[in-house]
C-alpha cells in the first residue's frame, strides 16, 4: 500500500509539472520550494489524501476546459464565421489571490467581470466556496503569460459513458485493439481529464476542417463517375463525397464520421452510397465489411431500392419475425438496413434481467447465445433521419449509442428543432471528444446558455459544427452554382408558398367560440384548484381539440384512439404527468400517444375535458352537447354530418380545381397533389368529399402496413387517374421521394416548423421538373395563428445554432407552461 501511494503521488507530481509546462512555467527543481499558494507534498513520504483529490476533482474542471479553449483561441482557428463580441476579456496577467470569510456571493455584474468567456462558472460550482482569482482586464489578442495560481491542480478522473465502451460486445470475431482502431473500444473504463489531454482532444477535432481542402472543380468533374455507381453525381454531391471521405480518413482522430445535414431533397442517400463504394473496409481491419443503415420503417424499402438500382452494392433488409435467420449471412452483404424499432427491441433484450427471474449474470450469459445486431463490429453505421434520437434519454438514442462501429454518420435535414441540447445526442452517438461527455457539454453549452451567454454558446456551436457537420441549403447552392464559370448549376424548380386564410361561416364561428369558452372555463378550474401543472396532459388535449375544430367540427366526435397517428394509444398513461414538466411542447405533444381517457377513475367530457358528475352517462358535457346541436341545425344532410363542408374542406376542393394547362411541353398531365394532415380522422373526412367529387386518390397513414403504403405510392407514380395522396404528416414527412406530385396542401399547422419543411421537401427536391406550389391553411382568429408565432421562435433558434440566423438571439430554449396558456389567452403569457 505504501508503494502504491508513492507511485500515485509521483504520478500526480508529473501531471502537475506537465500541466504547468504547457503554460510556460519552469517546474524543474522546484518541488521543495514553498510558495504563498497551496503547496504540493514536499517529499515522496508525504501522502496525498484520496478524499482530498476526489473532493477537488469537480472544482477544477472549469480551469482545465478554460485553458484548453484559451489555447485553441491563441492558434486562431478559422471557422469562417463573423467575430462575436464576448461579454468578458481573457487575461494574460498573473492572478491576484484574495479571500475573506465574510465574502458574500457576487452579484451578476461582478461575476460577469470575473468570468472567463471560454469556461463559464456554474452557479452550483464549488469555486464559490474557496479562494477565487480576480482577473485584470487586458486585450483578448495578447498571449497568455505564466500562471502561478494552479500549482496544486490535480488531474480529474471522469467516467467514460457506458455506451462508449465495449460492454455490449457479443461477437465471436476478433475484437479490435487500441492499436488498430479509431473508435472508443480499447480505452480504459476511466480517463484522466486534464487541460493537456482536453486540449489534445480539441486539437484533433479542429485541426482538419476538410471543407477548406476540397478539390478543385476539374477534379470534381473527373470524379463525378464513381466506379460501381450507375448514375453520375452532381457537383455538390461530389464535394460532399470529398468531405465524407476526409472525415473517415482524418488522421489520429478518436471519431470518424459526422453529420450530413443537407436540405431535404439534395441527395444525402446518394452521397452515402457513393461513400460506401469509394471507401470500403481495409483488409487489415477487425470488423465486418457491412454498413449498417438505421432508418424509419417507411424508408427501409426506399433505401433497398436506391442501393440496388443505383449501384452494384448488395443490400439486405433486417426486419420481421424471421430476421434472426439472416444473421448467419449478414456479413456477406455490403449494406444492412433495419429500423429504429428493431434496434430498440434487440437492445432492450440485452439490458433486461432475463426471463423466468434470471439473475443479471445468467441473463447476460443467455443473451450472448442469442445473436443480434449488437454482436457485430460494423465498418460504418448510418442513422437516417437522425433527429429521431434527439432525446438523449430515449430508448432509440441509447440503442444507437450502444452499437459498435468505426465510422458513424448522422443524416438529417433538421439537426436542431427545439433546443440546442438536441445536438448533444448526435455528438454522443458520434463519439466527438470531449463534447460527448455530458459534464463537458453541460459546462460549455447548457449552463452558459442558461446564464445569458447566448453569443458565446452559439459561437462555440458553430465552431464545433463547422468541423463535424456539412450543411448545404438549396438557396445557398443555387446562389453559388456556376460562379466559377463551369456552368455546374444546381437546377431546382421554384417553390411558391401561399398562406391561405380560411374564414369560418357563422355556424362554425359560433361552434368554435362556444368550444373555446368551455375550455377556458376548464382551464380556470385547473388554475383555481392549484393543479395546473398536474393537468399538463389535459391542457394538451384541450389544445388538440381546438385544432381539430379548426379542421372540421365533426372531427371532435371521433374518440382519441381512432386517430392513430395523432394519439396512437399506448400503455403507461399514468406516468405522463411526471414527465411533462421537463419536456418541450413538441415532446409534450408526443405524450398524447399515451392518453387513454376511458381508463380514468373520474369521468371527463371528451371534448372540453370538464369533469362530469358521477351519475352522468353521456360522453359530452351539457354545454358541448348543446354546441353540437346548434351546429347540426345548419347541416343540409343530417344523415351524413361528415359531408358538411367546413371552411378548410371548401378551400381544399377549390385548390384542387385550379389545374391549368402547363406551358412546358415536357410536363404533361394534371398536377398531382399531396394533402398532409396530422389527424387521420380529418383525412377520413376529406376521403368522403373526394369520393363525392369524383377525384382519384390513395391513402398513406399509420393504419396501413408497409406493403399497403408501397402500393399507394406506386399508384400515385404510375396511374394517371390517381391525382391525390392523402398523407399523414407523421408517416409521410420523412424521407419519401414524391416528385411525381407538384402541389402540397398543409391542412393544419404543427408546433415544429421543421416537420412541415420536411413534408414540403418530399416534393421539392432534385428530380422535380415543375414549380412546386405549397398551400398552408390557417383559420383566422383561432389557435392556429398563435401556433404560427411559436413556430417562428423555433426557426430563430435553429438559425442561430446553425450559423445562418440574424443577430438577435433566442433566449429561451424551452417552451413553458405559460406558452401553452398563451395559446388559450394572450393575457396568460404576460
Swiss-Prot record:
GO terms for molecular function: ATP binding; ATP hydrolysis activity; ATP-dependent activity, acting on DNA; damaged DNA binding; helicase activity. Residues 1-61 are annotated as: Disordered. It is found in: Nucleus. GO terms for biological process: DNA repair; nucleotide-excision repair. Residues 15-25 have a biased composition (Polar residues). It comes from the Eukaryota. PROSITE patterns: HELICASE_ATP_BIND_1 (PS51192), HELICASE_CTER (PS51194). Residues 1-12 have a biased composition (Basic and acidic residues). The modification Phosphoserine is found at residue 712. Residues 662-816 form the Helicase C-terminal domain. One of its GO terms (cellular component) is nucleotide-excision repair factor 4 complex. It holds the Pfam family Helicase_C. Keywords: ATP-binding, DNA-binding, Helicase, Hydrolase, Nucleotide-binding, Nucleus, Phosphoprotein. A motif (DEAH box) lies at residues 384-387. Belongs to the SNF2/RAD54 helicase family. This is Uncharacterized ATP-dependent helicase C582.10c. The lineage of its organism: Eukaryota, Fungi, Dikarya, Ascomycota, Taphrinomycotina.
